[in-house]
């Protein structure tokens, strides 16, 4: 037995060296030392075969005695030759085993005592827990108590929730990796004396380890199986989920429902006990719902459901759902199977319904331009486009030709009459056949008037004539205003890629409409603004109203229609120098016209 202080600087130099040398002179001690030295010499020869045998037996024995006495560090506190440092391990003096030459802290082996008198054998020798386990029955219970105090078996997988602020945002926390924890419950058992005593890091580099210690090291250092790891992880997930639900019921659901007089505590129970009961039952039902029966494991949706239930049941606006849960009107097995939309508070559900409704209304299915064929007994037959007008079989070609000639003659006579009327001065504007009745509504200024629209033309050729359809019900509702300096360049630029329909807006003949019409023109013209109208159909991108005074035609109108539409100007009504008018510009997405 040897004793030394916990320092690497005095390794091999202790105050009992003289006593040991004196013991070696005795016969029993010589016999034991001789066996130890011989075994050390054999191991040294195997590790270094290139070293030549020494002739001086006494010198060899002297050197090996020092090395054997020095031994190696292996203590229950985890100290070993690789990590031992006197600055870190301040556990006091160390004692050396007379059986395997291992160094151990006296306090670690005696459960905090400074002496080892109780562990000495009859012949005043010290043996470690591997050489004589019967001397260390007291360590098993003490180490178990130490593990239970120092190690938190149930690490919070979801982490603690900050409940100081009821208005805080719900934070969804990720799972904590089990590798980040110090020790698992199974690994804590490895501290027991009869289990993992010799660590793997200590076993491979020791020169004087006994055969028994090597066997124990090999048998006890088996790696845990994947199944054990999964079951441990699953257990921690379930424990922390139940803990999270317990906090949810005790701090939010039960107090809020009691305060709103929607729930009363049963007789003989308090908030904590009833919350724990609810939390346990809720976790059990959630576990059953998320259990993969085929593989016997939890699905990944388990953690997502825990967070979803927690965040929605914590919501103060979800008071009705909380009351249904605690009163039992909503069974827990149905609660765990509800999706996020069903768990949301009424305001969120109403908002989602409105959003879905708008999405469905704006949903457009584009009709492909490619020809469609269908397989029949005659082969592939082309299906004509339904949107194209079909020929009326009641009319023959001759009747259609005669009908066209009559219509042409009537059109010529109408044009002559129109020119004759236009030459005559008239105080009112002429309403042609293409005029569309409309109502102008300006809520921002509180102005309303009735009038009509005359179609002027389009910047591009359209697939079909939609100038009437684009106006819809004729109600022109002003949504806002836009600076003319911004709108004019935009319309000019977009006219290259989009079709723009142009109309001229006139008021009705009644005096009230004319007065309101003049106020609208003056307001927009003086402030340099144009009015934005709510689009009437799904293929309309923008709808603008542009003012004009003094009989001038806006430059943007000339830029959009161009010189090739100069004939369209004949359809403008004659404007006096002080006359006011409005022009409507409708930007159309042709790909949505069917």
UniProtKB/Swiss-Prot annotation:
Residues 23-65, 142-231 are annotated as: Disordered. It is found in: Nucleus. Residues 191-208 have a biased composition (Basic residues). Gene3D superfamilies: Transcription elongation factor S-II, central domain, Zinc/RING finger domain, C3HC4 (zinc finger). InterPro entries: SPOC_C, TFIIS_cen_dom, TFIIS_cen_dom_sf, Zinc_finger_PHD-type_CS, Znf_FYVE_PHD, Znf_PHD, Znf_PHD-finger, Znf_RING/FYVE/PHD. GO terms for molecular function: chromatin binding; methylated histone binding; zinc ion binding. GO terms for cellular component: nucleus. One of its GO terms (biological process) is negative regulation of transcription by RNA polymerase II. Belongs to the BYE1 family. This is Transcription factor BYE1.
């Amino acid at each position: 037995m040897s004793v030394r202080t916990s320092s690497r600087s005095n390794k091999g130099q202790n105050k009992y060296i003289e006593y040991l040398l004196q013991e070696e002179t005795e016969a029993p001690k010589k016999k034991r030392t001789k066996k130890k030295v011989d075994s050390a010499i054999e191991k040294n020869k195997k590790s270094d075969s290139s070293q030549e045998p020494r002739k001086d037996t006494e010198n060899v024995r002297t050197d090996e005695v020092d090395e054997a006495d020095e031994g190696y560090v292996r203590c229950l506190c985890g100290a070993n030759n690789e990590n031992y440092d006197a600055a870190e391990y301040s556990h006091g003096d160390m004692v050396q085993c007379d059986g395997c030459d291992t160094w151990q802290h006296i306090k670690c082996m005696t459960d905090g005592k400074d002496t080892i008198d109780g562990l000495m054998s009859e012949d005043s020798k010290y043996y470690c827990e591997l050489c004589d386990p019967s001397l260390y029955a007291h360590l098993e219970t003490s180490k178990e108590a130490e593990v239970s105090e120092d190690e938190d078996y149930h690490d919070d997988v979801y982490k603690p929730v900050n409940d100081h602020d009821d208005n805080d945002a719900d934070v969804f926390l990720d799972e904590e990796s089990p590798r980040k924890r110090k020790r698992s419950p199974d690994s804590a058992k490895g501290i027991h004396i009869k289990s993992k005593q010799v660590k793997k890091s200590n076993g491979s580099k020791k020169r004087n380890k006994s055969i028994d210690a090597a066997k124990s090291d090999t048998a006890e250092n088996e790696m845990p199986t994947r199944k054990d790891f999964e079951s441990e992880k699953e257990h921690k997930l379930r424990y922390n989920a139940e803990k999270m639900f317990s906090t949810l019921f005790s701090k939010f659901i039960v107090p809020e429902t009691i305060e709103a007089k929607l729930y009363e505590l049963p007789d003989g129970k308090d908030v904590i006990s009833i919350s724990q009961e609810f939390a346990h039952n809720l976790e059990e039902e959630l576990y059953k719902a998320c259990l993969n029966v085929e593989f016997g494991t939890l699905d990944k949706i388990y953690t997502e459901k825990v967070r979803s239930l927690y965040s929605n049941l914590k919501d103060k606006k979800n008071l009705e759902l909380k009351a249904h849960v605690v009163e039992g009107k909503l069974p827990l097995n149905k609660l765990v199977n509800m999706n996020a939309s069903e768990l949301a508070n009424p305001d969120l559900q109403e908002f989602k319904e409105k959003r879905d409704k708008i999405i469905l209304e704006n949903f457009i299915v584009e009709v492909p331009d490619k020809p469609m064929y269908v397989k029949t007994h005659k082969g592939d037959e082309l299906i004509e486009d339904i949107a194209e007008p079909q020929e009326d079989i009641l009319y023959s070609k001759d009747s259609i030709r005669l009908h066209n000639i009559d219509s042409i003659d009537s059109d010529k006579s109408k044009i002559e009459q129109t020119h004759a009327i236009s030459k005559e001065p008239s105080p009112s504007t002429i309403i042609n056949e293409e005029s569309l009745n409309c109502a102008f509504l300006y809520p921002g200024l509180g102005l309303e008037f009735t009038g009509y629209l005359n179609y002027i033309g389009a910047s591009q050729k359209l697939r079909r004539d939609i100038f009437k359809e684009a106006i819809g019900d004729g109600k022109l509702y002003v949504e806002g205003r836009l600076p003319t300096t911004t709108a004019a360049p935009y319309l000019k630029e977009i006219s290259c890629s989009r079709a723009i329909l142009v109309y001229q807006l006139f008021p009705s003949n009644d005096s009230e409409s004319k007065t309101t019409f003049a106020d609208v023109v003056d307001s927009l013209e003086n402030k340099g603004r144009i009015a934005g109208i709510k689009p009437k159909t799904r293929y309309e991108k923008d709808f603008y109203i542009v003012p004009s005074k003094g009989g001038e035609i806006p430059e943007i109108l000339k830029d959009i229609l161009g010189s090739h539409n100069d004939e369209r100007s004949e359809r403008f009504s004659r404007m006096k120098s002080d006359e006011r008018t409005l022009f409507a510009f409708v930007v159309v997405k042709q790909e949505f016209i069917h």
